[in-house]
Every structure is written in structure tokens, then in C-alpha cells.
Curated annotation (Swiss-Prot):
FAD-dependent monooxygenase; part of the gene cluster that mediates the biosynthesis of the indole diterpenes penitrems. The geranylgeranyl diphosphate (GGPP) synthase penG catalyzes the first step in penitrem biosynthesis via conversion of farnesyl pyrophosphate and isopentyl pyrophosphate into geranylgeranyl pyrophosphate (GGPP). Condensation of indole-3-glycerol phosphate with GGPP by the prenyl transferase penC then forms 3-geranylgeranylindole (3-GGI). Belongs to the paxM FAD-dependent monooxygenase family. Pfam families: FAD_binding_3 (PF01494). Keywords: FAD, Flavoprotein, Membrane, Monooxygenase, Oxidoreductase, Transmembrane, Transmembrane helix. Pathway: Secondary metabolite biosynthesis. Its EC number is 1.-.-.-. FAD binds at E35, G49, R108, D299, A312. It is a multi-pass membrane protein. Its cofactor is FAD. The chain crosses the membrane at residues 5-25, 435-455. The gene is penM. One of its GO terms (molecular function) is monooxygenase activity. It comes from Penicillium crustosum. This is FAD-dependent monooxygenase penM.
Length: 465
């Protein structure tokens, strides 16, 4: 059958949804995007990290050259501790050399604007389109909008975020609820004007007890920042905290004098803000990604903290894999795919994506607790091992990046470097586990009053790499 006879309905004009629209357009597959907001790129104060695995797909879609005009590649990361000790790492620069794409940040609003403005047929992107019901049959699926408009398609994709309507309808149709999402941290995030002393192309990570402040210094000194705090207890979705503008004030006032880099305080960051907001940080990878002719992608399927910077990149990879599987299936069809064929395809999609996403999610869970010095393990690991780890942070990031997915029906980017093959099947997992085992041993010894063994950890690990 012609690919344009198969119709995909994308719920959500998010980064996930708009990237999928670009992927489907390149594959020649008919689709429409339904976005409930009245504008395509609202400013909510958020920034987005584009890592090489996401950049590579965006390059395939001929979008990355435009994105490059608004980013400043990171070259250095500085990490600081409550006792005043600081060290710097060039791992971001090393990652760029290995993969041909940098680690970089830009306004979430700007990325959405690029995705929207460079989409060739804007009649396919419907704004102010609020879904009120979803029905699925053995032949097709139907979505009814608040204004009474009805859309019919062969597949519904939920790219509608952490509070996904499609996910809720999917659970209802499957007659099961599959929650598991929890919240233990909150995040105040924002964008500020340049601040003297914060150097373009650098990232600052300030680790305190149950508090992390991260700043990324982008194009022309624009500062993207996160303030992450541990909450009073663990919350289980949907009973999660919501924060209003009034609630941010007292928290900010309490932290204004905190110095996160040399003599620069959080108050300076706050006072120079252009925009800021506060949210709970949900964490989960859902087990159920599809049912019938409905499937999830992006934050509707998996939600992680911003510490690892992979949230948007995972959504971009989702779009690449789902569109590749659809393109391959439709090339072989003379008739619209049956329910069984759709279910097989969606099972393949989950089989490809779930293990990779889950692995990165676990790293994200570790990082948010490690950076917030949550417990003696993370406190000692951060203070006494991390400053002497050498290239291990770059190696771990490389392992994560190298497994990235591509649009199988589009040419691979020519700018890719040696790291994609070198680190795809590297044995870094063994090194990480060795670090953890040694650190646990060190903790035992430290309890007996012998801290010297902790200082020997980097030497012992380097012997195993």
C-alpha cells in the first residue's frame, strides 16, 4: 500500500510529537499533530540538553544546522562541594571529539520553534486541539475533540507528556492501571541573563546535602540553570506535589545567599532571571507502552530527572525507532496492516526502546541522588572518588550515547566520529560495578576509622580499565 494511505494521529505537539511528525514526513507516512496549547512554542522557562545521540537524529532530519546557531558547545564542567573544594573536567569536550556532536543546551521554546517553523506542512499541526475521547477498533481509531471535530487514523501516538491523556485512555481500554511513577525531588529551573564570572561553554555543578545547583552557560553567556532539592518524603503519582508561583518565593529567599561558584550566589542567578518555574521531578519507566492501536513515546512512556540531560534525546530516539518500524512495515504491505501486525510492530518498538531507556533512567536515578549527596555512599563517592576519576565520566557518557538510534530509512550523518562504534559495545559496565564494590569496601573500612583506602580507589579502578 502507499504509505500515505496509513494515517497516524499524534497527540501532543511536544518535542517528541513534532520530531515524530518530521520523521513521518521524511518517510512519506500520513499524519496529523493535535496540540492543546494555542501556540506551538510557549515559554515556560525550561532549557533542553541536546546530546550527540539526539543531535545525530536531528541532523538526519536536516534540523541540526539551524539548532547550531543557538547553542554553545560545552567544553568544561566544574564540580564543587560544601567544604569549598572544586575541580574541573574536560569530559564535555572529549565527548564532542568522540562523537562529532557536542553536549549543548538551548531554550526549550527555541527548539519547539525550530521544529514547528521547519515543518513543511503546518496544516497538519492543529493548535488549540483538546482531546475529549479516544476510541479504538480492530480497523482504526477515533479521537473526538472538544469542539466536536473527529479524527480517524490507523495508529494513535501519545506524545502528550507526563500527564498523558493517551496513557490514561490506554489503561482504561486495557482494564488495568500501571502506575509506579514516584516523586522525591523538586526542581526550580530558569534562564538568566549573563553573569560575570560564569564563562561561556562551561557548566557548574554545586553539590550540597539534599541540594544541587547546576548552571550551563550557553550562547552569548545565556545561563540555563536548575536548583534540585530533595522533598520531605516520597510521593506516588498521581498524588504528587504541585507548586505555584507563591510557593517559589520562600524557597528562593531561604537559598539566596548560597554560593554555588566562587562568590556567585543563587540570589544573583535569581535576580538576573528572564523566566523561571518550579516542578516536581517524576521518575519512572512504564511497563506498558502500547495497547491496541495506541502507543506512547517520550515523557508519556518514561520520565527521568534533568541531571543526565537525556529526557528530550530519548524522545527523539523514540521517534526515530517508531517511524523506522512503520516505514519498513508499510513498504511490505498491499493492504492496511491488521491489528495483529500493528501489535507485533508496537511490541518490536517496546523491545528496542525499553531496555535502553530503562538503563539510562537508572543512571538518571543514581545521578540525582549522587549530586544531592543523598546518603553516605553518594557523599563519599562524590567527594573522594569523582575528583580523581579521570576520563571515567566521559567514558560512562560515551557508553550511554553510543547506543543511540537512527532513522533507518535516512542516510547516516557524515560528521559522526569514531566514538559511535568504539563505545557501543564497550565493557564499561564492569568498571562501574567494580567502582561500586570498591566503594562499599571503602565504606566498611572508613567506619573502622581508615579513610586512606578511599583515597586509593582511583588507582585501583585505573588498573582494571
Amino acid at each position: 500500500m502507499d504509505k500515505d494511505q496509513f494515517h497516524v494521529i499524534i497527540v501532543g505537539g511536544s518535542i517528541a510529537g513534532l520530531t515524530l511528525a518530521h520523521c513521518l514526513h521524511r518517510a512519506g507516512i500520513s499524519h496529523v499533530v493535535l496540540e492543546k496549547a494555542s501556540e506551538p512554542a510557549p515559554q515556560i522557562g525550561a532549557s533542553i540538553g541536546i546530546l550527540p545521540n539526539g543531535a545525530r537524529v536531528l541532523d538526519q532530519l536536516q534540523l541540526y544546522e539551524t539548532i547550531e546557531q543557538y547553542i554553545e558547545p560545552l567544553e568544561t564542567a566544574t564540580i564543587g562541594y560544601p567544604d569549598g573544594f572544586r575541580f574541573s573536567s574536560s569530559y564535555p569536550k572529549l565527548v564532542n571529539e568522540r562523537f562529532g556532536f557536542p553536549i549543548a543546551f538551548l531554550d526549550r521554546q527555541k527548539l519547539l520553534e525550530i521544529l514547528y517553523q521547519h515543518y513543511p506542512d503546518k496544516s497538519r499541526i492543529r493548535l488549540a486541539a483538546r482531546v475529549v475521547s479516544i476510541e479504538s477498533s480492530s480497523i482504526d481509531s477515533t479521537i473526538t475533540m472538544e469542539d466536536g471535530t473527529i479524527y480517524k487514523g490507523h495508529l494513535i501516538v501519545g506524545a502528550d507528556g507526563v500527564h498523558s491523556r493517551v496513557r490514561a485512555e490506554m489503561w482504561k481500554a486495557a482494564q488495568r492501571i500501571n502506575p509506579g511513577m514516584t516523586v522525591e525531588y523538586s526542581c526550580i529551573f530558569g534562564i538568566s541573563a549573563p553573569i560575570k564570572g560564569l564563562i561561556v561553554g562551561e557548566q557548574v555543578n554545586a553539590f550540597f546535602d539534599h541540594l544541587t545547583i547546576v548552571t550551563i552557560h550557553g550562547k552569548k553567556g545565556r545561563v540555563y540553570w536548575f536548583l534540585i532539592q530533595k522533598l520531605d518524603r516520597k510521593y506516588v503519582y498521581p498524588e504528587c506535589p504541585r507548586f505555584t508561583a507563591k510557593e517559589i518565593g520562600p524557597i528562593v529567599n531561604h537559598l539566596k545567599e548560597v554560593k554555588f561558584f566562587k562568590d556567585i550566589t543563587f540570589g544573583q542567578l535569581w535576580d538576573s532571571r528572564e523566566t523561571a518555574s518550579m516542578t516536581a521531578l517524576e521518575e519512572n519507566v512504564f511497563d506498558t507502552w502500547y495497547h491496541g492501536r495506541m502507543v506512547l513515546m517520550g515523557d508519556s512512556a518514561h520520565k527521568m530527572t534533568p541531571n543526565i540531560g537525556q529526557g528530550a534525546n530519548m524522545a527523539i530516539e523514540d521517534a526515530a525507532v517508531l517511524s523506522s518500524l512503520l516505514s519498513d512495515l508499510l513498504q511490505k504491505q498491499t493492504q492496511p496492516p491488521t491489528n495483529a501486525q500493528i501489535e507485533k510492530l508496537l511490541a518490536q518498538y517496546r523491545e528496542v526502546r525499553h531496555p535502553r531507556v530503562n538503563s539510562i533512567y537508572k543512571t538518571s536515578r543514581f545521578l540525582v541522588r549522587f549530586q544531592a549527596r543523598d546518603g553516605i555512599f553518594n557523599t563519599l563517592f562524590g567527594r573522594y572518588y569523582a575528583p580523581h576519576a579521570g576520563d571515567l565520566p566521559a567514558d560512562m557518557a560515551s557508553k550511554t550515547i553510543a547506543g543511540g538510534e537512527l532513522c533507518a530509512y535516512l542516510p547516516s550523518p557524515s560528521r559522526c566520529s569514531y566514538g559511535w562504534e568504539k563505545y557501543k559495545n564497550s565493557g564499561l559496565g564492569r568498571t562501574v560495578w567494580c567502582v561500586l564494590v570498591l566503594l562499599l569496601s571503602a565504606l566498611t573500612w572508613s567506619c573502622l576509622g581508615n579513610m586512606n583506602i578511599i583515597m586509593e580507589l582511583p588507582k585501583r579502578v585505573s588498573m582494571m580499565r
